[in-house]
Amino acid sequence: MANVVQAKDNSQVFGVARIFASFNDTFVHVTDLSGRETIARVTGGMKVKADRDESSPYAAMLAAQDVAAKCKEVGITAVHIKIRATGGTRSKTPGPGGQAALRALARSGLRIGRIEDVTPVPSDSTRKKGGRRGRRL
């Protein structure tokens, strides 16, 4: 696990919060600045019992609060946020838990550095799932 980080009086100790918000689940994953060491990783599915609630804003909020508590324990006082949707040939908008997770991190007392959208956007995509005539209902 991560060691406790010592900071100077007025300086911030930064981590990177990677929020992956799909329509099925929300991941809140905090690493050090290089991304090599995981400090905390909690998902919406770890916080609620019903499968349908995994991607809900409430589950994302609980996950983010857990992650924030772990960050403070380790000594991280500020985070850069990278928010991501499924992307590629699928949805390029983050799921319902993305905004809630971001707000929960901000309200928990962690300072927010940069907020960046890192959804993978294809320059020229592979063929989309569903076939020539698309998904028929």
Swiss-Prot record:
Listed GO CC annotations: ribonucleoprotein complex; ribosome
Record GO terms (molecular function): structural constituent of ribosome
Pfam families: Ribosomal_S11
PANTHER family hit by this protein: 40S RIBOSOMAL PROTEIN S14/30S RIBOSOMAL PROTEIN S11
UniProt-listed GO biological process terms: translation
Region described as Disordered: spans on this chain: 116-137
Protein name listed in UniProt: Small ribosomal subunit protein uS11
Similarity section: Belongs to the universal ribosomal protein uS11 family.
InterPro entries named in the record: Ribosomal_uS11, Ribosomal_uS11_CS, Ribosomal_uS11_sf
Biased composition (Basic residues): 128-137
Native source organism of the sequence: Kluyveromyces lactis (strain ATCC 8585 / CBS 2359 / DSM 70799 / NBRC 1267 / NRRL Y-1140 / WM37) (Yeast)
Gene assigned in the entry: RPS14
Entry keywords, A to Z: Ribonucleoprotein, Ribosomal protein
Superkingdom of the source species: Eukaryota
